[in-house]
Amino acid sequence: MKIDYVSDLHINHWIPWNVNQIKWEKRTREIVNRLISNGNGEVLVIAGDFTEWNQQTLWVLDEAAKQYEKVYFTYGNHDLYLLSKSQKRKYSDSLGRLNDLIQKAADMKNVTPLIKTTETYKGKVFAGDVMWYLPKGIEGWDFFKGVSNDSNYIWLNGYNKVDGVRAMWKESMDWYETLENTQVDVFVSHVPPVHNPYSPFEPNTCYMVDVPFINAKHWVCGHDHLQAEFDKDGTSFHMNCIGYPYDYDNYPSVNVIPGEEVDSYKTFELKTFEI
């Protein structure tokens, strides 16, 4: 089985929200088709951080579902962001926004969210969740409070910022520990469980999550905006983060579909592995 994968689309930075919804939808679908044009797998995996707008995420999923037998996705931190007062009124809190996305995506017959769930597809076990991080030490919490936008745009009713992070981390961990005796073929998370050895940055507890075990053959993740594949302790890790337009040498203007040569290192396309 061939599996195409991608994460950290941040599509609203490439195709920003437009009061002209018809134009916004058309451009969004066009850039998705550009992104997946090199795909050749049966399954597409999207490891979170679609956009700050659910409607745009649904267009991404709908367009991808036209070309794949199965689309699996989990959510990222940006998929919880509430940027405006109207979003806060509409969703109440960040989990309200997530639940709205899950409910609407459920209408797409070959699209399946992996959010604290497992599913067997053609004999292969897929599992996934955001796998929320837990900042550690003064340095980790200072980064969360002073640098990370998560502390500004994620709202959980009944929790302050610190307790909200702890609660999301605990929910991820409680579920993950139930998989100890499950052999997983493909695990999908937004936050990686290991530090990327190709990363130019020092390890940061807001960009990875410690797990008690890893029993997946393949692990697709993102969050750190890097594109890399590496093996560690018998697991193959796959990262294909698209990230923001300004991360690319050939900075494409917003609302313009990227050409083939976008960067001397990064690519704007899917990557594939086989199981």
Curated annotation (Swiss-Prot):
InterPro entries: Calcineurin-like_PHP_ApaH (IPR004843), Metallo-depent_PP-like (IPR029052), Pantetheine_PDE (IPR052963). One of its GO terms (molecular function) is hydrolase activity. Signal peptide: none annotated. SUPFAM superfamilies: Metallo-dependent phosphatases (SSF56300). Transmembrane segments: none annotated. It comes from the Bacteria. This is SPbeta prophage-derived uncharacterized protein YotB.
